[in-house]
Amino acid sequence: MVIAVGKDVHVFLMRLTLPDRPGSLGSVATAMGSVGADINAVEIVEKTTDGSVVDDFIVDLPPNQLPETIVTACQNLAGVRVEWIARYPEGGGLQSDLEALERMTADPPHAAETLVSLCPVVFRSHWATLIDASENIPRSSYSTTLAPDLTPEIAARFAPFDTTHRIDLESDWSPGWGDTTAVVTPLTQDRVIVIGRLGGPAFLDSEIARLHHLAALVK
């Protein structure tokens, strides 16, 4: 489980694994409410083969509550596991793939850049970047605000660029950066998108499949 907090941030994104049966979501909502949390949004991320479901929650916590309190409240429930909790921009929402697609098709010449800019919200990544490998010297051509600076040498670490894959990067893979998990997927013959999470958790197979699908729609 990953916990990332900020003193002036009281909106959190939580990812939970819970039993896929009637009443589970209600029990989680009751547990969250018991510590003063308000649920703003819920989204099903993945249903697993073992009878569990992975859900994302956006919750408000009162200023006097630490995120550990809601983690404990949820994990006291049978079969519930908190995968991670992280600060979230106030007013942010759980943006769907369909909304991302609509924005991409509204401006086809810049569909790749649009997808990159939306990835931190749609896929709960900390950053995203567009890598151009057209001249055998990979370089970042467009990035979100929190993305690392990628020299050609660092960008080359995300190869191969012709297939979708995960990559785990050790601390200091880029100056000042800690352990990072990332996904690489081709956009066009010469361009790929990379999304990353500092400190994890690893991207689920369903998230990778969704990213691959959206990337395939970039012309």
Where does each model-flagged region fall?
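Amphipathic alpha-helical "output/dimerization" segments
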Residues: 203-219
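Short strand->helix junction
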Residues: 60, 200-201
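Hydrophobic, Leu/Ile/Phe/Ala-enriched alpha-helical segments that form helix-helix packing faces
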Residues: 74, 78, 115-123, 215-218
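GAF sensory domains
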Residues: 131-196
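A conserved regulatory-domain signal marking ACT and ACT-like small-molecule sensing domains
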Residues: 2-106, 118
